[in-house]
């Protein structure tokens, strides 16, 4: 249990809080959303890949037709699945969808869909043939070869394009998995469907899943013998898949997210924008906020915090929780972050091959709030900035705007960081869309606009915001006011998993928080 200290001792009081009233519609929406954070295991978008795997390996008892029809509706005009604006994340989803439609060819007419998908795969350039970016889909080095083998087994003509770098990385990951012998709730379990063979009962975690992955859980169930001994395990896993199908907003049996539950991740990452916007002390929010802060404090252990209580602790959620709780006046120990520190980089989990610039920035930001500094990490962040002022190629998010926000939080107060963040500010101003928003896929999105607004707000607090930056801030807020009511199912997926996804409540918290910021 964490100990709370008085508000007069809260260490992060640089900005004056704005006296909103309960009549403020944005404040009222925050009051309504705060108690929902983490409930129901978290709210997250549906996954083409995981849905296809569930339909193939563990079809719902009510039938597969609604799920297959949903899969068909997700196909893009060019024949592939996933956003054409983010081609790196399409191949795995496309192959998985084709396998599912091919398997059920006698149930649903998908001939045209399959032909279009195969044609798409033949013409889509293999984007990780020679190099493997840090922004690779989660587990791709294992999942892609597995899907190709599945296609060959089912006699589906999936083209085998050059992927030397990816296959090499996959072999390294398999060696690592064999060495560590992963257990329930560990990161390798999240891709168990691609490397596992024996459905060990001990692999089932406290959520009733294999690695919080519907795909892995479905394949594990398909390989689990049916007998009296395994029936209780089967019931737990089937109940998990049923619950997972109810959190995407579609409510179609078998249509599932790519990762779930995410209750601790949703809570930590949803409260983080309140920290950025200096709203943790907002008097009107306290009745709704304090129980959630207590929940986060109870969940943070000496080992950190994970995306749920049944998954390994990770550096990203831990850094966010430490920053939030310390700022809110809780007694927490920043040394918890030490176990996630590498040589100038911070990791989510041990054994990771790709690095995360946003996670490292969040850790540096958290340490700064404690009055601490990791100068090696600061130097890495500074050296990682591109000539255009951006930080690209992150492990967990495809938008450079997400990176820019976290890097500005980490570097704006650093003596060596002024030049870098001013360069980033110039790029933010120049890249703002004509409607006042921001977006990296060719369209403006509310969440990315919130990152831009909060970046400029942070620069304002450090007396680094230019007049052009002030104008960009006001234009960004004006756009957000018109876009904040965007329906969840219409959101652009920008967060990286086995495919791109949307954590609905987290994005909404960023947007509402950005609307409540103010510059003089």
Could you say what each language-model-derived stretch is?
Residues 2-5, 9-22, 40-66, 83-112, ...:
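An alpha-helical repeat/solenoid feature that recognizes helix-turn-helix modules
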Residues 29-38, 191-204:
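Repeat-mediated protein-protein interaction surfaces in helical alpha-solenoids
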């Amino acid at each position: 249990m964490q100990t709370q200290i008085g508000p007069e001792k809260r260490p992060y009081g640089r900005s004056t809080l704005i006296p909103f009233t309960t009549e403020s519609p944005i404040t009222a929406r925050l009051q309504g959303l705060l108690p929902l954070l983490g409930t129901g295991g978290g709210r997250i978008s549906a996954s083409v890949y995981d849905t296809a795997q569930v339909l193939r390996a563990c079809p719902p008892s009510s039938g597969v037709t609604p799920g297959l029809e949903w899969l068909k509706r997700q196909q893009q005009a060019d024949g592939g699945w996933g956003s054409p604006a983010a081609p790196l994340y399409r191949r795995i989803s496309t192959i998985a969808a084709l396998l599912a439609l091919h398997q059920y060819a006698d149930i649903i007419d998908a001939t045209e869909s399959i032909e279009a998908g195969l044609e798409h795969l033949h013409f889509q350039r293999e984007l990780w043939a020679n190099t493997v970016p840090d922004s690779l889909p989660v587990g791709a080095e294992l999942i892609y070869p597995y899907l190709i083998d599945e296609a060959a087994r089912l006699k589906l003509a999936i083209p085998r394009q050059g992927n030397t770098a990816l296959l090499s990385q996959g072999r390294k990951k398999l060696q690592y998995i064999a060495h560590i012998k992963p257990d329930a709730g560990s990161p390798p379990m999240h891709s168990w469907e691609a490397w596992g063979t024996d459905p060990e009962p001990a692999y089932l975690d406290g959520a009733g899943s294999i690695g919080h992955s519907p795909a892995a859980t479905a394949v594990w169930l398909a390989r689990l013998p049916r007998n009296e001994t395994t029936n209780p395990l089967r019931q737990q896993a089937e109940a998990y898949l049923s619950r997972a199908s109810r959190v995407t907003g579609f409510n179609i049996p078998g249509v599932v997210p790519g990762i779930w539950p995410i209750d601790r991740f949703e809570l930590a990452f949803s409260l983080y924008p309140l920290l950025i916007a200096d709203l943790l002390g907002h008097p009107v929010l306290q009745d709704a906020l304090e129980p959630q802060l207590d929940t986060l404090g109870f969940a943070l252990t000496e080992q950190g915090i994970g995306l749920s209580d049944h998954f390994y602790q990770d550096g990203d959620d831990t850094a966010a929780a430490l920053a939030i709780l310390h700022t809110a006046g809780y007694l927490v120990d920043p040394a918890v972050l030490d176990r996630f520190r590498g040589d100038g980089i911070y990791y989510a989990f041990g054994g990771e091959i790709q690095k995360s610039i946003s996670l490292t920035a969040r850790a540096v930001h958290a340490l700064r709030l404690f009055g601490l500094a990791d100068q090696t990490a600061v130097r890495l962040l500074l050296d990682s900035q591109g000539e255009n002022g951006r930080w690209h190629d992150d492990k967990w998010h495809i938008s450079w705007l997400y990176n820019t926000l976290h890097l500005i939080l980490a570097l704006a107060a650093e003596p060596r960081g002024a030049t870098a963040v001013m360069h980033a500010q110039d790029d933010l101003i120049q890249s703002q869309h004509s409607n006042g928003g921001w977006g990296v896929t060719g369209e403006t999105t509310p969440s990315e606009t919130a990152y831009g607004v909060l970046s400029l707000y942070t620069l304002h607090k450090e007396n680094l915001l230019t007049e052009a930056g002030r104008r960009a801030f006001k234009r960004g807020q004006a756009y957000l006011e018109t876009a904040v009511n965007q329906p969840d199912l219409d959101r652009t997926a920008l967060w990286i998993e086995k495919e791109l996804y949307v954590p609905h409540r987290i994005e909404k918290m960023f947007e509402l928080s950005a609307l409540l910021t103010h510059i003089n």
